[in-house]
Amino acid sequence: MHHNVRDVMIEVTHGPCLLDNNVFASPCTFQQFAQGTALVHNLIAGRIDLHRVMDRSTPYHFPHTTEVAGCAFVSGGDDRYYNNVFTRPDGGEDCPGEIALGAYAGY
């Protein structure tokens, strides 16, 4: 885990996805190319970088099955944060994204 760019990256999922009980201590905490993620009981000490994926339609499924319900773009922004602690990163000025929930300001 030495010299990694970010703590976590999620790519092209329509959810649900759960990230719980983590310590995200890198200046570049979370890169999100997805939607439908719940972040619960985490310490988040870096920047959050959100992306829309509007050039790649991907399948999504009916609940509780692997049957494909259709295809859609990832418009992002549909994430939930519950009981997290946010701190200002030490450094990370070269990291993309915003501090805490500032990344969601445009949604």
Show where each model-derived region lies:
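Glycine- and acidic/polar-rich repeat regions and solenoidal domains
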Residues: 1-107
